[in-house]
């Protein structure tokens, strides 16, 4: 199965929802030439993780993972074959153009949107006296702003503390913990991390947030802070796929699809997720007057990508089939890649609570939609159509 590294970036090349953004001459650069042969990489990966954790919260950032994998192609002697296996047509695009595209994309995502608080990056930790070649270090720094830090200690506890402290500093304290009980035979540990929090275009008022029941399953109920909003909100009820949803925009380029499967239909809805489904939903959204209840929560997850990428067709990086001879000076390179994602969903209001006015009056005759059972949260950047976050929320408490 041919998989594309670049997740959802070029969905705007299709009709409807994906063609809302104008393209300037400056923007028509190499990052737009990253059009994948299979833009369903994000959903393939998400579905695999959900299958492995069907009764648990699942959270990943496909675009962040994509950048990490593209960066690692710089380390392999057979990089052309590696990139072709990931879905790139190397007869139409050079390796340099691919990396230049990711370089520009990274700049767009991290600098052009004031409505998203996002910290995203890659950092390589070198163990067991591993020394990387200057050319590889220069390329990863230039294209991906990646750092390489040496861990001199063979004490795994101290090594884990160094990794955690570095990521905590890079995310301004948002991500405090990445690894625990670190015991790895790897000589290079790549940490791919992202923190995301958005400001809603139509914010919730903290004055209206209240404690409500959330039904985790048939036997388990938890109390969660439930945000409340009343107004015209983009809504769609799917007659073909058993779910209903709202689309809510962040200030700036961010947008979200918050999907509520019918009772017991989570697996059916997850199986139906793909580019065409999201495109169809976007076209069919209509404003509806409603009382909307969504849990306020903070979620984080950590994955060893070796465990999941092999299941979606990418495994050679973690085996002796990858030739890293052009990357290291002496010590053989063995690789571990960890993905850490954190999502914060709150009222998203830039104003102090005291200035938000009195609690909203919820009209009794309005339609009420409560996300009080497991749901799906998808966040995209509308300008690049990058898949920022994908989450299955089984228990927001």
From Swiss-Prot:
Keyword terms: Glycoprotein, Lipid-binding, Secreted, Signal, Steroid-binding, Transport
Signal sequence range: 1-22
Cited CDD domains: serpinA6_CBG
Gene Ontology MF, one: steroid binding
Site, Conserved cysteine within steroid binding domain: residue positions: 243
Residues reported to bind cortisol: 247, 279, 385
Transmembrane segments: none
Major subcellular site: secreted
Tissue specificity statement from the Swiss-Prot or TrEMBL entry: Expressed by the liver; secreted in plasma.
Domain remark text: Proteolytic cleavage leads to an important conformation change. This reduces the affinity for steroids.
Similarity annotation: Belongs to the serpin family.
Protein name: Corticosteroid-binding globulin
């Amino acid at each position: 199965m041919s998989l594309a590294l670049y997740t959802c970036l070029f969905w705007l090349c299709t009709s409807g929802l994906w063609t809302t953004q104008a393209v300037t001459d400056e923007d028509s650069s190499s990052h737009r030439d990253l059009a994948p042969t299979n833009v369903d990489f994000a959903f393939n990966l998400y579905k695999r993780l959900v299958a492995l954790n069907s009764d648990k919260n699942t959270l990943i950032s496909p675009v962040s993972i994509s950048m990490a994998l593209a960066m690692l192609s710089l380390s392999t002697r057979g990089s052309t074959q590696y990139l072709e296996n990931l879905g790139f047509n190397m007869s139409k695009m050079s390796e340099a153009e691919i990396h230049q595209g990711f370089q520009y994309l990274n700049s767009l995502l991290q600098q052009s949107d004031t409505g998203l608080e996002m910290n995203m990056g890659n950092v390589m930790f070198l163990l067991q006296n591993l020394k990387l070649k200057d050319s590889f270090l220069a390329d990863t720094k230039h294209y991906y702003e990646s750092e390489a830090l040496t861990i001199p200690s063979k004490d795994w506890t101290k090594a884990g503390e160094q990794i955690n402290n570095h990521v905590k500093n890079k995310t301004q304290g948002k991500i405090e913990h990445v690894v625990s009980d670190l015991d790895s035979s790897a000589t290079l540990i790549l940490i791919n991390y992202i923190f995301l929090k958005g400001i809603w275009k139509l914010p919730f008022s903290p004055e209206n947030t209240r404690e409500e029941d959330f039904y985790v399953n048939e036997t388990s109920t938890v109390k969660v802070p439930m945000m409340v909003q009343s107004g015209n909100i983009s809504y769609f009820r799917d007659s073909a796929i058993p779910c209903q949803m709202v689309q809510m925009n962040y200030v700036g380029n961010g947008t979200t699809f918050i999907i509520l499967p019918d009772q017991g239909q989570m697996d059916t809805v997850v199986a139906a997720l793909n580019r065409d489904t999201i495109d169809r939903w976007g076209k069919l959204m209509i404003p509806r007057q409603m009382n909307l209840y969504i849990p306020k929560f903070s979620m984080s997850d950590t994955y060893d990508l070796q465990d999941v990428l092999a299941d979606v067709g990418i495994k050679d990086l973690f085996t002796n089939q990858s030739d890293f001879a052009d990357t290291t000076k002496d010590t053989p390179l063995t690789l571990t890649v960890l993905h850490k994602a954190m999502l914060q969903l709150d009222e998203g209001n830039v104003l102090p609570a005291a200035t938000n006015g009195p609690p909203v009056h919820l009209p009794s005759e309005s339609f009420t939609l409560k996300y009080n059972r497991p749901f799906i949260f998808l966040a995209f950047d509308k300008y690049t159509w990058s898949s920022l976050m994908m989450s299955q929320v089984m228990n927001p408490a």
